[in-house]
């Protein structure tokens, strides 16, 4: 299942960092963060809204910005649009001021998109509607390269390096999906590996924290 592949990969990615706080934004990203604890990042605190922080906490308004600038706060987002330069859109589809569809707004993306802290973009479809040449509205500016920026999609895992997307690995059928979004170019080097499933350890962690499989609904599965 693509949901397990991407959620499990995100869990592995989070567990491999030294972040102290993770901000989940969807059910799948919350499951991934809990699984990351079982994969080795036991003391990871989860920020789950304005009134909930799982883990030891201090009531100090500037802490979030300190963590961001020190590379210690991880975020995974599901943008409405993500473009070839890494700009993100959560506000609307169509011309600024007269969008065809108005959405929830940028929330913390203006602060998160270009910091030393890691940021993952998790999209359920590798679609030309989501992955575009330039976003309709910039909610998060193009990253400068200060921190890890990774896209996880049904086509595979892709890193933003020096303003260009590069394939780390491809999911089965990934090349065809990349070709269907030509405005969002991805460099696929010769010998790029294919990955059809996440690790057994990640699958076990997902099952432990999400036995009902709620993560899969985000990907139209389950």
Language model features with spans:
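N-terminal active-site beta-alpha-beta segment that forms phosphate/nucleotide-binding
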Residues: 1-61
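Short, Lys/Arg-enriched charge-dense amphipathic segments
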Residues: 40-48, 102-105, 210-222
């Amino acid at each position: 299942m693509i949901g397990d592949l991407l959620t499990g990969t995100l869990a592995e990615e989070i567990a491999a960092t030294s972040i102290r706080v993770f901000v989940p934004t969807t059910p799948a990203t919350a499951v991934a963060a809990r699984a990351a604890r079982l994969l080795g990042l036991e003391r990871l605190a989860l920020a789950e809204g304005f009134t909930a922080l799982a883990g030891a906490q201090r009531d100090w308004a500037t802490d979030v910005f300190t963590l961001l600038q020190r590379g210690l706060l991880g975020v995974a987002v599901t943008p409405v649009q993500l473009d070839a330069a890494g700009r993100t859109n959560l506000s609307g589809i169509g011309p600024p001021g007269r969008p065809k569809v108005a959405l929830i707004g940028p929330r913390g993306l203006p602060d998160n998109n270009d910091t030393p802290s890691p940021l993952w973009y998790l999209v359920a479809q590798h679609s030309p509607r989501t992955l575009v040449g330039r976003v309709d509205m910039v909610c998060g500016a193009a990253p400068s390269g200060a921190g890890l920026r990774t896209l996880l999609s049904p086509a595979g895992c892709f890193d933003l390096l020096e303003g260009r997307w590069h394939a780390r690995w491809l999911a089965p059928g990934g090349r065809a999906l990349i070709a269907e979004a030509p405005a969002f170019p991805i460099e696929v080097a010769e010998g790029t590996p294919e990955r059809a499933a996440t690790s057994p350890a990640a699958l076990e962690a997902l099952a432990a924290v999400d036995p009902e499989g709620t993560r899969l609904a985000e990907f139209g599965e389950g």
